[in-house]
UniProtKB/Swiss-Prot annotation:
Acetyl-CoA binds at residues 377, 383-384, 402, 420, 437. This is Bifunctional protein GlmU. Pathway: Nucleotide-sugar biosynthesis; UDP-N-acetyl-alpha-D-glucosamine biosynthesis; N-acetyl-alpha-D-glucosamine 1-phosphate from alpha-D-glucosamine 6-phosphate (route II): step 2/2; Nucleotide-sugar biosynthesis; UDP-N-acetyl-alpha-D-glucosamine biosynthesis; UDP-N-acetyl-alpha-D-glucosamine from N-acetyl-alpha-D-glucosamine 1-phosphate: step 1/1; Bacterial outer membrane biogenesis; LPS lipid A biosynthesis. Binds 1 Mg(2+) ion per subunit. Mg(2+) binds at residues 102, 224. The lineage of its organism: Bacteria, Pseudomonadati, Pseudomonadota, Gammaproteobacteria, Alteromonadales. PROSITE patterns: HEXAPEP_TRANSFERASES. Residues 227-247 are annotated as: Linker. The gene is glmU. It comes from the Bacteria. It comes from Shewanella woodyi (strain ATCC 51908 / MS32). InterPro entries: Bifunctional_GlmU (IPR005882), GlmU-like (IPR050065), GlmU_C_LbH (IPR038009), Hexapep (IPR001451), Hexapep_transf_CS (IPR018357), MobA-like_NTP_Trfase (IPR025877), Nucleotide-diphossugar_trans (IPR029044), Trimer_LpxA-like_sf (IPR011004). Its EC number is 2.7.7.23, 2.3.1.157. The active site is at residue 360. Residues 1-226 are annotated as: Pyrophosphorylase. Keywords: Acyltransferase, Cell shape, Cell wall biogenesis/degradation, Cytoplasm, Magnesium, Metal-binding, Multifunctional enzyme, Nucleotidyltransferase, Peptidoglycan synthesis, Repeat, Transferase.
Length: 454
């Protein structure tokens, strides 16, 4: 028996006031529908049917490389009609799990509970109790057993008083589902084919109907406009922040942090306000992350410090190392143990060795730098000749004076000293002192320029 997931993603989302299909709007830097697809994989889906309509080309350009069966709903005639478009991809013995592309916070654990609640060849529906159920379909019970779902516009006064509502998420047996979908009618206030009508059909046919509920109602809330999208974003961030704190992070203010990927932290990590973490970020023990830092696809080792307003992207920061404030580690950069870069230092595709330092105002690109090296302010590795990149090698215990340019390819030997203001175009041997600046001249009585009168 296969788990066949149908994700409804055909809506335009008019209230978003956007050319982008609604389900492509992001939560935590990932489209809503991608969150749902990932959750479907997490519950062990054997196949995913993505029912699309408006903006199909944009959807396929974003999601096209994934293992999905694309099912077109040419006309938007209701949720029942949408699911029916996938009938040819549903086997009789499938368990069909129906999800929604604009409900991104649904948890795998909730769906697992729903599937567990379903009896053999039965129908399981996910419900939730709301203090204000206005706008939602109500769960109709008799003797505590579900007998149907009534939509808001079709409900009478007694039914409108029901607080248990339909989330739309359900698990159904493939054979019966296809039969029920074929019996749907659009004879209702909306003139649509309601998926919810299959619940009454299941009751009629004597099929066991069971229910499950999520831990929080926010899991089943959708986003129809940008206000609701922002509310879901905040809910996602609150949940992600809570997870970090339970793992051992101290968050200066959990409401002022953005987590946009897979973040893992060690013990006693301190994270200040307005930090953004994106992609896969791994943080060791006793790490300090300063205010406004941005971490993207990076590794921060034990006892390291990322000072305020620094950016670490696709880079590694070793144990005891530090970066910032206002430092930038670009892809391929690595700080070894106890290395340091200070304010306005940029590194790309370069390694700064153990205990080495670049305190301020430097660019280090395509470079291999040994241990115990001092990089003076204003140092530049000139790595690009207009066509190709070249490597700079600086061996252990080198002292590079301020405002030095190293024109790659070039190698500086161990213990060498480069005088301030030098432009190095040739290799330097170990323990040499090299100075290339012009000899200082003194011109007495030099007349300074005078501004012309207008």
């Amino acid at each position: 028996m296969a788990l066949n997931v149908v994700i409804l993603a055909a809506g335009k989302g008019t209230r978003m006031r956007s050319d982008l299909p609604k389900v492509l709007h992001p939560i935590a830097h990932k489209s809503m529908v991608q969150h749902v697809i990932d959750t479907a994989h997490n519950v062990g889906s054997d196949a995913i049917q993505l029912v699309y309509g408006y903006g199909g080309e944009k959807l396929q350009s974003v999601l096209g490389e994934q293992q999905l069966n694309w099912v077109l709903q040419a006309e938007q005639l209701g949720t029942g009609h949408a699911v029916a478009q996938a009938n040819s991809n549903i086997a009789d013995d499938d368990t069909v799990l129906i999800l929604y592309g604009d409900v991104p916070l649904i948890q795998a654990s909730t769906l697992e509970a729903l599937l567990a609640a379903r009896e053999e060849n039965g129908l399981a529906i996910l419900t939730v109790n709301l203090p204000n159920p206005t706008g939602y379909g109500r769960i109709v019970r008799e003797a505590n057993k579900v007998v149907g779902i009534i939509e808001q516009k079709d409900a009478n006064a007694e039914q409108l008083a029901i607080n248990e509502i339909n989330t739309g998420i359900m698990a159904a047996p493939g054979k019966q589902l296809k039969a029920w979908l074929g019996q749907l009618s659009s004879n209702n206030a909306q003139g649509e084919y309601y998926l919810t009508d299959i619940v009454a059909m299941a009751h009629r046919d004597g099929v066991a109907i069971t229910t499950a509920q999520p831990d929080s109602a926010i899991e089943v809330e959708g986003a129809n406009n940008r206000v609701q999208l922002a509310q879901l974003e905040r809910a996602y961030q609150a949940r992600a922040a809570e997870k970090l704190m339970l793992e051992g992070a101290n968050l200066r203010d959990p409401a002022r942090i953005d987590i946009r990927g897979e973040v893992s932290v060690g013990m006693d990590v301190m994270i200040d306000v307005n930090v953004i973490m994106q992609g896969k970020v791994t943080i060791g023990n006793n790490v300090t992350i300063g205010a406004g830092a941005i971490l993207i696809d990076c590794e921060i080792s034990d006892n390291a410090e990322i000072k305020p307003y620094s950016i670490v992207e696709s880079a590694k920061v070793g144990a005891e190392a530090s970066a910032g404030p206002f430092a930038r580690l670009r892809p391929g950069a690595e700080l070894k143990r106890d290395a340091h870069i200070g304010n306005f230092v940029e590194m790309k595709k370069a390694v700064l060795g153990e205990g080495s330092k670049a305190g301020h105002l430097a660019y280090i690109g395509d470079a291999q730098i040994g241990s115990g090296v001092n990089i003076g302010a204003g140092t530049i590795t000139c790595n690009y000749d207009g066509a190709n990149k070249h490597l700079t090698v600086i061996e252990d215990n080198v002292f590079v004076g301020s405002d030095t340019q190293l024109v790659a390819p070039v190698t500086i030997g161990k213990g060498a000293t480069l005088g301030a203001g030098s432009t190095i175009t040739k290799d330097v041997a170990a323990d040499e002192l090299v100075i290339t600046r012009v000899k200082q001249r003194h011109l007495t009585g030099w007349p300074r320029p005078v501004k012309l009168k207008k």
